[in-house]
Curated annotation (Swiss-Prot):
The keyword Translocase does not apply. A lipid is attached at C17 (S-diacylglycerol cysteine). This is Outer-membrane lipoprotein LolB. GO terms for cellular component: cell outer membrane. It is found in: Cell outer membrane. Monomer. The keyword Cell membrane does not apply.
């Protein structure tokens, strides 16, 4: 009986791995920055063993971004608003402001959300104008971040299904559930 359970578990594990493949970064196109999009999904962050998980809805309407951070039940618990004038974070009836998302989220949440680069990375593109390197496995190194792109193996898509970012004890994972 135990052997059957182990074999079934192994088969399910292998089947789950078979549905993913690496998504290789493409050269960044300047025109892509101006392409609006709406994306929903899940976000997880783990900083030195402490984890946070949330759902998100992100509207990118250049030069503005609006990211709603939602609880697992769908309630909006925070909003990040970015425009040329800076960034505002609204949560718990409070308002924080800064010049950029990275410093604001580091100050309030304890870890930086690289939104200015994530505009590119979520599409499987390196951010333009910034030095980057792609290794043999298709992983991107840019601005101190190690980025891994993963796609559904059975779906031909112009963007990755999952983006995993690591830097200085911090791992941020973004899983795309819908893209428009």
């Amino acid at each position: 009986m135990i052997r059957r359970v182990l074999l079934l578990s192994l088969a399910l594990l292998l089947a789950g791995c078979a549905n993913e493949a690496l998504f290789r970064p493409k050269p960044a196109l300047e025109s892509a920055a101006d392409a609006p999009f709406s994306v929903s999904g899940r976000l997880s962050a783990n900083l030195d063993g402490k984890g946070h998980v949330a759902n998100f809805d992100w509207r990118h309407l250049p030069p503005r971004d609006e990211v709603a951070i939602n609880s697992p039940l769908g309630n909006t618990v925070a909003k990040v608003l970015r425009d040329p004038g800076g960034v505002t974070l609204l949560a718990d009836g409070k308002r924080w402001q800064a010049d950029d998302v990275e410093s604001l989220t580091r100050q309030v949440m304890g870890w930086p959300l690289p939104l200015s680069n994530l505009v590119w990375w979520i599409r499987g593109l390196p951010a333009p104008g910034v030095e980057s390197r792609v290794d043999a496995d298709g992983n991107l190194e840019q601005q101190g971040w190690h980025i891994r792109f993963i796609r559904d193996a059975d779906v031909d898509s112009d963007h990755p299904k999952r983006v995993e970012m690591q830097r200085e004890g911090l791992t941020v994972k973004v899983v795309v559930q819908s893209w428009q």
